[in-house]
Amino acid sequence: MSKKNSKNKAGSNTIALNRSARHEYFIEEKIEAGLSLQGWEVKSLRAGKANISEAYVIFRDGEAYLFGSSFLPLQAASSHVVCDPTRTRKLLLSRRELDKLESLIARQGYTVVPLALYWKQCWVKVEIGLVKGKKEHDKREDTKAREWDREKARIMKNKHRG
């Protein structure tokens, strides 16, 4: 059985990406967490109806929750269950990971945001990142570096065409 490495293509394991997080924050550390879901949410994730671009992680009573994500219910979803697309979903992390994240957020000004939502075998996983916010000049430097890398690749491509 071969692994699937494609991102957001047919047959991909990726459900949703938070592209703005890579632009807005310095990503210090990435952690994989499970997600506690209801049945209709799993069905909507299989259909790819998820958005995590405005989401972040909050800590309450020693537990971590994904706040601000939206999973749109399907039209054919069960009518006896009330579907709340923006409900807070519990993250499944070990006690050690929870304590570490909570202490870093409290002391050093870090934030925890979701970076990606994906399938791992039959389970839905969320990749969360321990991040610090970028200043405006940091964003500009990243943009300049990215544009220069593109320009270098373009020059090398034209040079080799010859």
From Swiss-Prot:
Regions of compositional bias (Basic and acidic residues) in chain numbering: 137-154
UniProt-recorded Gene Ontology molecular function terms: RNA binding
Key words of the record: Cytoplasm, RNA-binding
Pfam families: SmpB (PF01668)
A GO cellular component annotation in the UniProt record: cytosol
SUPFAM superfamilies named in the record: Small protein B (SmpB)
Keyword Mitochondrion (UniProt): no
Gene3D superfamilies: 2.40.280.10
Compartmental location: Cytoplasm
A biological process term (GO) from this entry: trans-translation
Disordered: region residues: 137-162
Matches recorded under NCBIfam families: PRK05422.1, smpB
Record-stated family: Belongs to the SmpB family.
Entry function: Required for rescue of stalled ribosomes mediated by trans-translation. Binds to transfer-messenger RNA (tmRNA), required for stable association of tmRNA with ribosomes. tmRNA and SmpB together mimic tRNA shape, replacing the anticodon stem-loop with SmpB. tmRNA is encoded by the ssrA gene; the 2 termini fold to resemble tRNA(Ala) and it encodes a 'tag peptide', a short internal open reading frame. During trans-translation Ala-aminoacylated tmRNA acts like a tRNA, entering the A-site of stalled ribosomes, displacing the stalled mRNA.
Name the UniProt record assigns to this protein: SsrA-binding protein
Organism this protein belongs to: Aeromonas hydrophila subsp. hydrophila (strain ATCC 7966 / DSM 30187 / BCRC 13018 / CCUG 14551 / JCM 1027 / KCTC 2358 / NCIMB 9240 / NCTC 8049)
Lineage: Bacteria, Pseudomonadati, Pseudomonadota, Gammaproteobacteria, Aeromonadales
